[in-house]
Amino acid sequence: MGGLMVSFYQAFRFINVYLQYPIVVTLQMDQKQFLDFPAVTVCNLNRIKEKYLRCIHSNVSLDLCYVQGFLPVDNTKPNLIMSERTGLHSCTSEFRGNSDAEKDFTIQFLKTYLALNSKNRKKVGYGSKEFITLCSFNGKLCSAKDFTEFQNLRYGNCFTFNQLYQNESKPLTISQTGDQSGLVLVLDLLDLYYLNISSTIGARIIIHDPKEEPSPEETGINIAPGYETSVALTQTAVTRLPAPYRDHCGEYKNENIWPYHKSLNRCVRNCIQYNSFEVCGCADPTLPSMTSQKLCNLTDKSEMCCLDDILLLLLEENRTCDCPLPCSSISYGEKVSVARWPSASSFFTGEAEYTYYPFQFRKSRKSQAKLKIFYSSLTQKNYVQRPMFHESEIYSHLGGELGIWLGMSLMVTFEIFEIVCMLVKILINFLLRCSSNE
């Protein structure tokens, strides 16, 4: 009897662990002959050209603005970093009278910019042909036509190389390593068009999975003019298990349907907007939202504080968004190095050019940036989640416990169970016959 109780106790402990669905993570290093090249998104840190600022504040047609040559606004205001709403408002300071003219100016600009439709936002931003002045991939020339455009509220017009959509099957691949392979870009930042509230001159670079949309606010690096920035990449793949295992991973589909959870970041943003609209009656104007949702007023104290309260509530453990990790994801390790560019010896080809072209050299260093993105290794690092136990191991474990403590195999146990069932059946039939005879 003691052995039977111990075997049942051990079996109970095993089943309890099994129902927690533990996992093991395996690491594999796969040396590839060809490796998929990532998507590369580039954005200017200045989302709108300064020459259009007077026009959008005065509600002047952008076409007339360009023809009539409206002067830009006064440049005497101090520089500010372009930020989202949370970087401009705080219920504990600004709305108690501690706001300053700098933030007020930035808030007014954001209100005006967010009121523009997508067509006008595209007009006042940078075009791909003027922004991307040189492009090559694996030594072959490419152009601005090889980039897809999308709009971002913080960075304006952004451009993506090697972006995949549902009707496309495979991204570009690469078979060589080193800075002589991969993608090479020369970007013209057009610093003369920068707003006085854009305190940093440069470009935002996002390296991401070709099947995923970029998130410039959450990921990416900034590059500066006058430098060649080299980014050496390594690739890591992660495969997770769905429910009931601990990560409860999900699949994000690349669909333009609300809520269009193309990615984990988009899912979180949609969750924030949904809760904001439900509680505050309006959505955060600096995040993507449904066209039917009313946008909050950036200068309204109650609405801004309500949006802050929503973020605090969502940070609590019991109010998390239902946004699981993706079941499969690709990430890239980035090792960044920089060097001055261009050098005087490469820019000038003769003594005469030193006399006639010093201005162009200074302008190039002030406004242009060079970017190299390549793989440092074709080894893919794979992390794969696997179940620690399979269903068949339940029977194996039960049989093992019975064998250790009772000296019985699982087959013998089933035979005993079958005999007991037959005896019970015979006893029931006997009792039924006895009752009928009486």
Indicate where each model-derived feature is located.
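Long, solvent-exposed, non-transmembrane segments immediately flanking or lying between transmembrane helices
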Residues: 1-317, 321, 334-341, 345-346
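Long, compositionally biased charged/polar accessory segments in the mid-to-C-terminal portions
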Residues: 263, 272-438
